[in-house]
Amino acid sequence: MKKLFYTFMSVIALCEFVPTSAFAQKQYDLETAQPDTTKQNYHLIDGVEISTVRKLVSNNAVSSQLNNKTIERSLGQSLGTMLERVSGVSSIQTGGTVSKPVIHGMYGNRILLVNNGARLTGQQWGADHAPEVDKNSSTKIEVVKGAEAVRYGSDALGGIVVMEQDMLPYNQKHTHGRLLSMYGSNGYRYQFVGHAEGSMPFLPSLAWRIQATYANSGDQRAAHYLLNNTGTREFDFSTALGYQHKNFRAEGYLSRYDLKLGVLYNAQMGDADLLAERIKIGRPVDITPYTRHIDYPFQHIVHTNATLKLYYNTEKYGDFYWLASFQKDDREENRIRRMNLSYIPAVSMHLKTLQNYLRWRKYYGDWQTEVGTQVVNSNHSNQRGTGVVPIIPNHTENQIGAYALQKYQNNRLGAELGVRFDWQDTKAAGYDWTGDYYGGHRTFSNFTYSLGAHYHATDKLTLTTNFGLAWRAPHVFELYSNGNELGTGRFVRGDSTMCSENSYKWVVSTEYRSTVLDARLDAYLQWVKHYIYDRPMKGEYVTVISGTYPLFQYMQTDVFIRGIDFDLRLRPLSAIEYHIVSSMIWANETRTHNYLPYIPSFRINHSLTYTPHLSGKAFAPWIEVKHRFVARQTRFNAASDLIAYAPASYSLFGLEAGTEWRIDTHNTLSLFVSADNIFNKEYKEYTNRARYYAHDLGRDIRLTIGWKF
C-alpha cells in the first residue's frame, strides 16, 4: 500500500509539472533571471536540455530549456524554427519568413511570450504575424508545456515561452561580450550579432548591457525554384541598466525590433479561376531572377519595449517585486495597388500597451506563499488615409487580474495550489467597406485554478502531474475581422457573437536520468469549451480590388485534444550520444468528432553526435548527423479544406559540425557549420499556410563564426 501511495502521489505530482511551479522550483524568477548552476553540463549539440536541473527541491513544470549555445547555433533561423527542437513543439508557418511556435497544437494568442519579465503584447493575432522579438537578445529560453494561467493570466492555454537574459554583471571588473557573424546559402543571407556587458568602474553596483542584431536576405529558394520577393531586412537592439544595493535592485530595459519582409507574389493577385489554378498547381508560375530588393507587397513591423523592474527583499516580511512595461507596436502592410498608390500602406496599425505587475512572496520552512496582481491597458488604432478599410476596428482593452499561490516542498515531495480571477473590458468601433458602423462593448471575467504535485521516487526517477483551468477572451480580430491577410493570401471573417474559451488540461510526466540514459515521457489531455479557430470555407471566395481570396471563417466548437511527447538521450560511449524526439497529437470536435484543421502530424527527429575527447582543452570539436521524418496528416477534415488531401510525408537530413578554440581565459573563438535539407528535398508542411501556393524551403547551408571576450 505504501508503494501504491507513492506511485499515486507521483502521478499527481506530474500535474504540477506544468503550470504554476515552473519558475519557483528552478529559482528561475522572472525578475532575477539567475543562471542555473545546477544544470548537468552534457555537451548537447542540438542544445535541448530538458529540465536538466537536478536539485533537492522539486521541478514543478513540464518544461524544456534552450541554452545560450543553442541560440547561437540557431543564428539565421526564426524563433519558431528553433523551438522545434523541443518535444511537443512545432511551428505554424506562412511561407519561409514567418513562423509561430505551436505547443501541443496551440498557437497564436494561446501561447504567451514573456520577454525579460514582461508579457509580449504585439499584434500576433494574424497567421502571417510572427512574434515581434529578437531571440538573440536572450541567453536562456524556457518552454513551459501547460496552461500556466494562474501566474500570468489569460492567453496561456497552450503554454509559455519565457525569454530571459542573464543577471546584469554587478561588481564585474572586466567587460565581456560576444560577436557572431553568419552566412546562409538559401537567400544568400547574412547576419551579425553583437553583445557587451560590464559594470561601471567608478560604481561597481551599477551594471550595463547592450546588444544588437542585423540581418539581410534576398529571395529564398524552394528545392527547385525561387520564391520571389521573400527577402528580409532586420535591425534590432536592446540595452539594460541596473543598480543593486544590499536587498534592493532596480533595472531598466529598452529594446527595439525592426523587421521588413517581402511577401510571395504568387498568393496576392488574380480572379477566382486563377486562384483555383494556382492552388491546383501548388507552385508559382512566373519566376523572376534572384534579387535582394524587397518589392511590393511587403510588411514592416517596429516593436518598442521599455521595462522597469524593482525588487526588494525585506527578509522578515518576504520580498516585493514590481514590473512596469510600455510597449508600442507599429505594423504596416504595403500591397500592389493601382494608380501608383503602392507606397501608401494598405494596412497601418498601431498598438500601445502599458502593463503593471506587483508580487509579494514569502518563504517559511517548507512553505511558500505568493500573491500578485496585474493590470494591462491596450489601445489599438488604425492610420487614417490609407484608402483601404482596416481589417480590424479601433479598439481598447483593459485587463485586471489577481492571484494567490500556496506551495509546499520537501526533499522528495512538492505540491501547489493556485487560484486567480481576471476581468477584461473590450471596446471596438469602426466602419466596414459598406460604410456601416460596427463594433461593440464586451466584458469577460473568469476564475482560473491549478493543482499540482511532483514526487522524486528515486534519485533518477521523477513523477510530476498538474491539472489546471485556463481561459481566453476572443480577440478583436476573431470577433470583427473582415478583410484579407497579406501574407497568407486569404480573406478572414470574424464572428462578433463568440464567447470566451475555457480549457481544462491535465499533464503527466515521467522522467528518468542517469549517466547513460535520459528519458522523458509526457502525456496530456485537454478539453477546450468554445474553442475558436479559422475554418477554410471550401468553394467560397471573396473578390476585392487586389484579387480573389479563399474565405476563412472564425467559429467556435468544443474540442478534445490529447497527445504524447517522447524525448530520449542515449550515451553508449562517453563520446557518442543518440538523441530522439517524437510527438503525436489528436484533436477532435467533441460533438461531430471532426478533426481540427492545422494540427501537426506525427513527427520524429533523431540525431547522432560524436564529441572526441582531446588531450588538450583548447579545442572542443564535435559533429552531428540528424534526420527528421514527418508523416502525412491523415487526421484532418478533407471536406472543408481548400485541398482534399494533405501533403505527402517527407524526410529531411542534416549535418552539423563545429569547434571552439579557447585562446586564453577571456577569449574563445568558435566555428559552426550547419546543413539543413542537405539532399534538397521538395516538400510541403501541412501547417504552412502558404502550402497552397508554394513548397517549403530547399537546402540551406549556414556558416557561423563567433568570438567571446
What is the role of each PLM region?
Residues 471-472, 527-529, 534, 629-636, ...:
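C-terminal beta-signal and adjacent terminal beta-strands/loops
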Residues 162, 199-296:
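Periplasmic-side early beta-strands and strand-to-turn transitions of outer-membrane beta-barrels
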Residues 244-258, 290-450, 454-456, 461, ...:
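Face-selective signature of the C-terminal outer-membrane beta-barrel domain
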Residues 344-359, 401, 493-499, 505, ...:
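Outer membrane beta-barrel strand-and-loop segments of large Gram-negative receptors
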Residues 26-72, 80:
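Short, acidic, small-residue-rich periplasmic hinge/interaction motif at the N-terminus
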Residues 119-146, 170:
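Short acidic/polar hinge/loop motifs at secondary-structure boundaries
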Residues 524-527, 545-634:
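Gram-negative outer-membrane beta-barrel transporters
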Residues 160, 165-200, 212, 227:
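Short strand-turn segments of transmembrane beta-barrel domains in outer membranes
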